[in-house]
C-alpha cells in the first residue's frame, strides 16, 4: 500500500531489456536485496508486455509497467499481471484509447501512475505560463487526472518530474495543496552517480522534509543499485527511516596518522549488511 500514511517506499527501474526475462529477474533480485521495494520495467514491445507474467512469477516486489505511446502495451501488461502501470495520457492517444486502458485497470483494480515531465509539457501550457514552469506541470498533471476521473476511476498515483531541482520542489508544493492522491517523487535525468545523488538529495530532502511524497526514486545514470543506496541514505538522513548503521567519519587533516579514508570505506562496506540495526558508528 502506498499513500494514506503508509511508509515511503523506494523504487528503481531496470535497465535490462524486459524481453530478456532471466537478465531482468537477476537485476530485480539484486535491487531487492539492496532494499528496492517497487520496480519499474520498460514495456516498449508486445514481447516485453508478455514477459511481465514470467517476471512476476520470479520476483517478490511489485512490478510497474512503463508505457509510452501504445495503449495496447498497457492492456497487455495488465493482462499479464503487472501491479501498476505508468502512463502519460497525453501520449497514449485518443480518449477512446485512454478509456480502453482505464477499463482494464478498473476491472482488475490496477493503479495507474499518471506521469508528466518538464521535457514534454504541452505547447499551450508553455505559452500560457511563458515557458516550462512548476505551475504548468501541475496544471498538466491535474488535467490528465481529470480525464481518468471522468471515466469513473481514481486508483491513481501522480508523478511530476523535472531535471530542474527547484522547479520540481515547487511543483510538489503546489500539487500537494491541490490533491490527496499519492505522489511519486524524484528528480528526473539527474545525472551520474555523484552529481545525480547530490541533486536528488537536495530535491528530495526539500520535498520529503515538508511531508510530501509517498514513493521515491533517485534517478541515476549508473548501476540501479546505487539508486537504492542513495535513496536509503536520504530517508535515513531525514529521519524518515531508522534502520541501518550510520557511519560518521573524520574528514582527515594533516594530523591524520593512519589510512583513515581506506578504513572508513571498509567499515562502510562491512556495515551495509546490517539493516536490522539502528546504530551510529564513528571512524576517527
Summary of predicted features, one role per range:
Residues 35, 58-61, 78-85, 106-108, ...:
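Glycine-enriched alpha-helix->loop->beta-strand junction motifs that scaffold or abut catalytic
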Residues 35-37, 80-95, 187, 210-224:
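Glycine-rich phosphate-binding active-site loops on the catalytic face of alpha/beta enzymes
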Residues 1-13, 106, 263-269:
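N-terminal amphipathic alpha-helix/helix-capping segment at the start of soluble metabolic enzymes
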Residues 4-23, 42, 61-69, 90, ...:
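Active-site mouth loops of central-metabolism enzymes
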Residues 45-67, 100-112, 174-183, 265-272:
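Alpha-helix-loop-beta-strand connector modules within alpha/beta enzyme cores
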Residues 72-113:
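Hydrophobic or amphipathic alpha-helical targeting/insertion segments
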Residues 117, 125-282:
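Catalytic alpha/beta core domains of metabolic enzymes, predominantly
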Residues 12-21, 32-58, 86-94, 155-165:
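Glycine-rich, proline-tolerant flexible connector loops at the mouths of alpha/beta enzymes
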Amino acid at each position: 500500500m502506498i499513500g494514506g500514511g503508509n511508509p515511503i517506499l523506494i523504487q528503481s527501474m531496470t535497465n535490462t531489456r524486459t524481453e530478456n526475462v532471466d537478465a531482468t529477474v537477476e537485476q530485480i533480485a539484486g535491487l531487492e536485496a539492496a532494499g528496492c521495494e517497487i520496480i519499474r520495467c520498460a514495456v516498449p514491445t508486445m514481447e516485453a508486455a508478455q514477459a511481465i507474467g514470467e517476471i512476476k512469477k520470479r520476483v517478490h516486489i511489485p512490478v510497474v509497467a512503463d508505457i509510452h505511446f501504445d495503449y495496447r502495451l498497457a492492456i497487455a501488461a495488465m493482462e499479464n499481471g503487472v501491479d501498476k502501470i505508468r502512463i502519460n495520457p497525453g501520449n497514449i492517444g485518443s480518449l477512446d484509447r485512454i478509456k480502453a486502458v482505464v477499463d482494464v485497470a478498473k476491472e482488475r483494480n490496477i493503479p495507474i501512475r499518471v506521469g508528466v515531465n518538464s521535457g514534454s509539457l504541452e505547447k499551450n501550457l508553455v505559452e500560457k505560463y511563458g515557458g516550462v514552469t512548476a505551475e504548468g506541470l501541475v496544471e498538466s498533471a491535474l488535467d490528465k487526472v481529470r480525464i481518468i476521473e471522468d471515466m469513473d476511476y481514481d486508483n491513481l498515483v501522480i508523478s511530476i518530474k523535472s531535471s530542474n531541482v527547484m522547479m520540481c520542489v515547487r511543483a510538489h508544493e503546489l500539487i500537494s495543496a491541490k490533491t490527496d492522491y499519492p505522489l511519486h517523487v524524484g528528480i528526473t535525468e539527474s545525472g551520474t552517480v555523484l552529481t545525480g545523488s547530490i541533486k536528488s538529495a537536495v530535491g528530495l530532502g526539500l520535498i520529503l522534509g515538508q511531508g510530501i511524497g509517498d514513493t521515491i526514486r533517485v534517478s541515476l545514470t549508473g548501476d540501479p543499485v546505487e539508486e537504492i543506496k542513495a535513496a536509503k541514505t536520504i530517508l535515513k538522513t531525514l529521519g524518515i527511516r531508522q534502520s541501518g548503521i550510520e557511519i560518521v567519519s573524520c574528514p582527515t587533516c594533516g594530523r591524520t596518522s593512519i589510512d583513515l579514508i581506506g578504513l572508513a570505506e571498509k567499515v562502510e562496506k562491512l556495515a551495509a549488511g546490517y539493516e536490522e540495526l539502528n546504530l551510529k558508528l564513528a571512524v576517527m
